[in-house]
Amino acid sequence: MFTETYTLIERVLKACTDETEIALTDGGEHADLASTVAFALAKKRHQAPKVIAEELAVTLAANPELAGIRVEALGPYLNFSFGPKYLEETLKAAVQDNFGTAPTKPVRIVLEHTSANPNGPLHVGHIRNSILGDTLARAFRKAGYRVEVQYYVNDMGRQIAIVAYGFDHLDTGAKPGEKADHHIARVYVAANRDLEANPDKGAEIDERMQLIEKRDPATATQFRELVSRCLDGFKVTMQGLNVKHDRFIWESDFVKIGDMEKVLGRLAKIPQAVPPTEEDGTFSLDLSSCGYKKSYVLRRSDGTSVYAARDLAYHIWKGRNFDRVIDVLGADHKLITGQLVCTLRLIAEKPPEVVHFEFVSLPEGSMSTRAGTFVSADELIEEMQKRAIEEVQVRRPEIPVEERDAIAASVARAAIRYDIIKVSPEKSTVFDWKEALDFDRQSGPYVQYAHARACSILDRAGPFQERYDLLESPYEIALVKHIAKFPSIIESVVRDLRPHMLATYARDLADLFNTFYHYDPVLKGEGPVRESRLTLVLAAEKTLKEVLETLGIDALRSM
């Protein structure tokens, strides 16, 4: 209802003012929406904004299209307040299943996220990427878009050559119960130490890079087998966080089918190309026209391609097969992403929309796979589950161990996902163990608990007749009006690629529901008032469920 009402007011205002751009803002304590259009008209009409606002208020109040909406002038501002009809229509929509889900749109979106190098387990920095990307994908689907979520697999990088070297010369086998990605990390760290101690062995890494570029069958098979094992470990980690990819795209495939060479051939013909010379055998691009002083290297002097060359082929393929291309990448990728976008534009190919995120860390310190001093995502999840079990045990000591552990696993996922998604991508953050698991504050479990409370109220109430009127208290009205905004929040998230807005909305919804429940008796109410409030609880429960699922958090009925 909020989006429809916003659009209606915007259209009517444009019609009666002849303005092409109308900005409607939150009305704060005075109204639901407000407009400053009187300021723009004042310059044209040579009248005071206050006078214009008063005249417009009279005109708009008499407009039958705005029936049920109170229009008032407050100084130079126009205020719009929604009436009982708005509340009733919101409730009728919100008690339906799949509230907030938009009709299917004829737009195909490809969204790439995570795409971590397969040389060790995911750490907390990687899973910020995963959670941002997964939440965006869920929001796009909620908004009616067809989305394919991809993981771009780096199976030709130098890191993989080092992993292969380690398995050939240093591997002592996996430890009992050790995940494949953790095993690979141990071998990778050992191989790096061996190469640092014996620099002459670096020639073997160079040889492996030459072989994979030439698609040597034995090398290609070994690289893919090792990478696949690491990816299997990644999938287990991401499954524990409710993160899923639709498709894994291998960078070596773009070399195998010739797409990369086609791209390099096209780029060799543009004015920005810097061909190899006897002194410098690299092939690069001069991107100074885009503000980049450093050359964009695409092929090394030994003839092997670099990651950027394969990435260009991948992005051209995405741009030709999807309507929107979205990448979720760390802030450390800003330079290479900028060079990629510049290059794609030079050859008239579709550039990606990029969500850059700053790093997330733990209070214990930083993470580095190469040095072997990192906190893996698996360790983070395991520790959070232990803490969640302790919390659930205190709150529900009577439940069976199996039920306790299942609830704790969901609570742990909620704690991690919410604590990471609540911060806007461009801000760095430190993961807070205590705050993430706080049932009584602004956390994932806090929103889950509000949903479980709504379910409990409905279960205790038994059957009732839905009623959409008689909502009069300020707590009821505030809750309904917030529920009405859910579809517009989804639209804002996908338009601006700002998934943290969804977390803020969920927290505020839980706050408003808990405040309503505290001040307005539901089960102790009588007659029509009880039915109206139970209908509001049902609407809140369904909206909480939808927003939790869009956040990738389990909507538990009992905690």
From Swiss-Prot:
Residue span of motif 'HIGH' region: 116-126
Class of the enzyme per the UniProt entry, highest EC level: ligase
GO molecular function: arginine-tRNA ligase activity; ATP binding
Pfam families linked to this entry: Arg_tRNA_synt_N, DALR_1, tRNA-synt_1d
This protein's GO CC annotations: cytoplasm
Keywords, in A-Z order: Aminoacyl-tRNA synthetase, ATP-binding, Cytoplasm, Ligase, Nucleotide-binding, Protein biosynthesis
SUPFAM superfamilies membership: Anticodon-binding domain of a subclass of class I aminoacyl-tRNA synthetases (SSF47323), Arginyl-tRNA synthetase (ArgRS), N-terminal 'additional' domain (SSF55190), Nucleotidylyl transferase (SSF52374)
Subcellular location: Cytoplasm
Stored InterPro entries: aa-tRNA-synth_I_CS (IPR001412), Arg-tRNA-ligase (IPR001278), Arg-tRNA-synth_N (IPR005148), Arg-tRNA-synth_N_sf (IPR036695), ArgRS_core (IPR035684), DALR_anticod-bd (IPR008909), Rossmann-like_a/b/a_fold (IPR014729), tRNAsynth_Ia_anticodon-bd (IPR009080)
PANTHER family (UniProt xref): ARGININE--TRNA LIGASE, CYTOPLASMIC, ARGINYL-TRNA SYNTHETASE
Protein name: Arginine--tRNA ligase
Source organism of the structure: Methanosphaerula palustris (strain ATCC BAA-1556 / DSM 19958 / E1-9c)
Organism placement in taxonomy: Archaea, Methanobacteriati, Methanobacteriota, Stenosarchaea group, Methanomicrobia
